[in-house]
Amino acid sequence: MHSYVRPNQFVALRLPSEFTKIQKIEPDSTVFLGKFGSFPANQIIGRPFYLTFEILDDADEKDGSCLRIIPAAELHAETLIAEGEGDGEELDTNEDGTPMRTNREIVDDASTQKLTWEEIEALKKESGGAGREIISKLLESHQTLDQKTSFSLAKYMLRKRRKYMKRFTVLPLDVSILTNHMMEDQGAARIMELRDEMVGLLGCWGNVHHGGDASLDEAIAAKPNGRYLVVDDTGGLVVAAMAERMGILYPHDGDEYEEQGSSDEPKKNEAEQAHDDEQPPTESSTHRPARPAHMSASGNSITVLHPNKQPNLSLLKYFGYSQDNPDETHPLHKHLKTISWLQLLDPNADPIYSEEPEIIPESELYTMKSNKRGAYYRKRNRWTRVQSVVNEARAGEFDGLIVATVMDPSSVLKYAVPLLAGSAHVAVYSPSIEPLTELSDLYSTAKKTAFINRRQQLREQKLQQSSDQPDANETELQDSDLSELMAEFYLDPTLLLAPTLQNSRVRPWQVLPGRTHPLMSMRGGAEGYIFHAVRVIPTQQTIQAAGNLSRKKRKVVTQETPTTAVDSGSGVDVEMKS
């Protein structure tokens, strides 16, 4: 992530009213903040994040306003003064220890404020001190200000600052800020009411992390790491959260990206470089260079599974990536792959996959117009990319499955779980608990036991029937067993282990002596739940837990103890035999 504001970048502007405005900073433009005013965008380009600015009216400026950076001492001056005044102050208390000074006798209505609405509006037009003069006038004209407690006065001052102070803080736009902004201001239904804490829990239980950097030879020789299969109906929010955890969400800085880009290319040693420099330019050096083929990342990638012709990843535009016009320098250009359900289940029915464009010789290509030649290369590259992504996805061996969809989760897991590698994590989000409880029942221990017993019965029946037919193939018998099992069971419950349901919600509280309670203004909505399980590879052999039969029992040797004579004076009864 960049450390300062760059041109054409989306940033988050935190206003005094606690409202977050997401704005694209375009050069030579004006940013409007509603009642808080406006300012030129050029005045914050190149400045670091987390600075608080104050909008001042300045007639000398072209736009009529300028910005002033508020230092930390001034920003927290009110808090420091309030803490200093409260030190050593002793309040009068009653017999039970409660403070005598309360707000019960205060009637906070319009009659307590001498300033009228017309006078306040006139002060807004005349004052250029970013709202400080209005707040001071309101405090001077308040009749019951001296009767307020320190806590009530602090809340009153906070409300007036949020209403009249012309300040804003520039924050870098990350997934957490975007999630809270979508939940509070842009409609939570667009992201399935996925809260910030649930986004973190989804990535945690899905074991989403960076797969590590590996060279091309190592990736070919071994299995690539960090390959995740995603079903996202939140507009790309889940994909953005995963990419942030994997380190492929934000565009590279200019200098750093050039260094990383040059490291990916094969470097020549000093002798070869010197030899190339000494060679004079030849006629072949002016020949048209070969068009580079599109290379996709083999590891540390995200494969999005979607039901439409194109996936809905509109929220990725806030992080510099557009699906319609992708930037080739963005990390997601190589690490993000898309595949439809049709291409996964029946790829031959998709014309993009099955119909290969006509191959045109190079000699004929040079005679074509540039627009036709470019269209030909785009079709060939698109077909090659679709072929590669579909074949790679159908081969499976993914390291994790993340699902946040409005479809039935069981229908998604029926076809997606077999594509996972062993020990891969599965995390499914749902706003309500009912779809996930049904999913937990499908993968429960009782269903596993019934599935295994029924499979064993079918195999025994097939073996008895095939005893009369010695030419019967064993693989055909197994396929017939699976077909009959899938008719009775919706999915294979032996593919996932330890299904659990998770829930988490952050609730803000007001913490005061005797007045501690959750904030009444907190947002409601769906709780949100997560289903988690681990992919296992079931064995094809019958397992019988009979214990260790080779272990021998230990023999207990009893020794006879000699009897001793009993004294008559010991008080012990002795049986006398004649």
Swiss-Prot record:
Name its cellular compartments. Nucleus
Residues in coiled coil = none
Give one GO molecular function term.
RNA binding
Main location group = nucleus
Which Pfam families does the protein's record reference?
A: Gcd10p
Q: Which InterPro entries match?
A: TRM6 (IPR017423)
GO CC terms, sorted: nucleus; tRNA (m1A) methyltransferase complex
Q: Where is this region: Disordered?
A: 253-306, 459-478, 558-578
Q: Specify residue ranges for compositional bias: Basic and acidic residues.
A: 264-278
Q: Which residue windows does the record flag with biased composition (Polar residues)?
A: 297-306, 558-567
For biological process, the GO terms are: tRNA methylation
Keywords of this protein's UniProt record, alphabetized? Nucleus, RNA-binding, tRNA processing
Question: Function, please?
Answer: Substrate-binding subunit of tRNA (adenine-N(1)-)-methyltransferase, which catalyzes the formation of N(1)-methyladenine at position 58 (m1A58) in initiator methionyl-tRNA.
Q: What's this protein's family per the entry?
A: Belongs to the TRM6/GCD10 family.
The record's subunit annotation is: Heterotetramer; composed of two copies of TRM6 and two copies of TRM61.
This chain's protein is named tRNA (adenine(58)-N(1))-methyltransferase non-catalytic subunit trm6
Species the sequence originates in: Aspergillus oryzae (strain ATCC 42149 / RIB 40) (Yellow koji mold)
Q: What is the lineage of its organism?
A: Eukaryota, Fungi, Dikarya, Ascomycota, Pezizomycotina
Designated gene of the protein: trm6
